[in-house]
């Protein structure tokens, strides 16, 4: 089922009076509030595709004829929503919304969809597939990071079914974490692109999981990577962004990750050197939203995701600064303009965006990554 919806423009003035430590959440009924109605619309986007097998873009290396199988046989839990990582974060979307709206009209259908996917048998199939020695780089780091986010969301939900799903997912969670831990010490350079392989965004997701899971080893590896890759960075060329099919900002994603790792004073100093062009006079003109020319093109439609992720990254960066920092108004004003541009594009009209943009909308409107 494909359902479209329209979310009206939000005035930047809503944000300019906010503090950095907690950008003012939208109130009930405001245009971009994550209320029950909006949650229902976002949930329907995931429900429409979680078990829709085709069209499907698999990232599948075949070793022989026996590997020629349909997606549902290769990865029996996460075979819908066009690709593996979108299927994974579509499940995350439902879990996050169910935690906030457990009695909503969509709740029964969402629980049924999760129960259909997150069975021990299905997860065993996922472990078998991902554990193959020739698939060391499968969905690394983006898809694996989202898998850990799904696990973190389930871990934080005090619900009997959620506990069952979390237990079923544990072997795959452990495998994903192990693969990332094996990779991180060998990664000699950061990956600074605007698509899936980018390290900064995935590092943020993994960092947040490690805090929930209490995985000090993962936190230590990421802290070491921070020192090697990002601590000395200066003058990030934000003016060169975006590339034509970005859905993540290399500069903003790095800053949004670093505010997780550094203390507020250290982050403020680092940010001044890294993005010296953030105005101290307010306004949103310094970073206009990206322009989408064709939402039926799966790559060009990435810019809708860029606008969504920029919005939450800008809010996250502001959240990492002290309330009196003069850069906060400009950060939140730019976030507001990106919200206003991006949220109306989150519809099911075109599957090219409908299969994944709902997750980005929920990540933004639920203030994920800032708990």
Features from the language model and the residues they span:
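N-terminal export leaders
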Residues: 1-6
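Well-ordered alpha-helical scaffold segments within catalytic/enzyme domains
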Residues: 27-34, 45-48, 88-104, 145-161, ...
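Solvent-exposed loop and edge beta-strand segments that line ligand/cofactor-binding
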Residues: 27, 31-36, 71-88, 128-145, ...
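Extended ligand-binding groove/face enriched in aromatic
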Residues: 88, 97-210
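Low-complexity, Ser/Thr/Pro/Gly-enriched N-terminal "stalk/linker" regions
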Residues: 27-79
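Long, repeat-rich segments with strong aromatic
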Residues: 213-352, 356
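Bacterial N-terminal signal peptides
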Residues: 8-17
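Bacterial Sec-dependent signal peptides at the C-terminal "C-region" and cleavage site
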Residues: 16-28
């Amino acid at each position: 089922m494909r359902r479209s919806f329209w979310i009206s423009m939000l005035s930047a003035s809503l944000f300019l009076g906010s503090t950095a430590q907690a950008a003012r959440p939208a109130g009930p009924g405001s245009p971009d509030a994550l209320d029950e109605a909006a949650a229902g619309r976002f949930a329907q986007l995931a429900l429409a595709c979680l078990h829709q097998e085709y069209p499907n873009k698999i990232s599948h290396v075949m070793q022989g004829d026996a590997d020629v199988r349909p997606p549902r046989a290769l990865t029996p839990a996460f075979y819908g929503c066009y690709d593996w990582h979108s299927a994974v974060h579509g499940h995350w979307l439902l879990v996050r919304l169910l935690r906030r709206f457990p009695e909503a009209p969509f709740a029964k259908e969402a629980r049924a969809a999760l129960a259909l996917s997150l069975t021990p048998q299905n997860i065993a199939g996922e472990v078998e597939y991902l554990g193959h020695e020739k698939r060391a780089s499968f969905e690394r780091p983006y898809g694996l990071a989202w898998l850990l986010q799904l696990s973190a969301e389930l871990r934080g939900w005090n619900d009997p079914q959620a506990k069952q799903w979390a237990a079923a997912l544990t072997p795959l969670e452990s495998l994903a974490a192990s693969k990332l831990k094996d990779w991180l010490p060998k990664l000699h350079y950061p990956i600074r692109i605007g698509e899936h392989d980018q390290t900064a965004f995935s590092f943020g997701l993994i960092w947040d999981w490690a805090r929930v899971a209490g995985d000090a080893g993962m936190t230590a590896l990421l802290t070491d990577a921070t020192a090697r890759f990002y601590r000395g960075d200066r003058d990030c060329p934000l003016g060169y962004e975006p590339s034509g099919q970005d859905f993540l900002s290399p500069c903003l994603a790095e800053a949004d990750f670093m505010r997780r790792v550094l203390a507020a004073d250290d982050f403020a100093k680092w940010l001044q050197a890294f993005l010296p062009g953030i105005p101290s006079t307010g306004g949103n003109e310094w970073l206009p939203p990206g322009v989408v020319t064709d939402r039926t093109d799966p790559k060009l439609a990435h810019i809708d995701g860029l606008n969504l992720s920029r919005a939450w990254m800008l809010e996250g960066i502001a959240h990492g600064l002290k309330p009196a920092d003069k850069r906060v108004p400009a950060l939140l004003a730019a976030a507001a303009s990106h919200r206003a541009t991006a949220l109306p594009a989150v519809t099911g009209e075109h599957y090219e965006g409908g299969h994944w943009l709902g997750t980005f909308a929920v990540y933004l409107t639920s203030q994920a990554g800032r708990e």
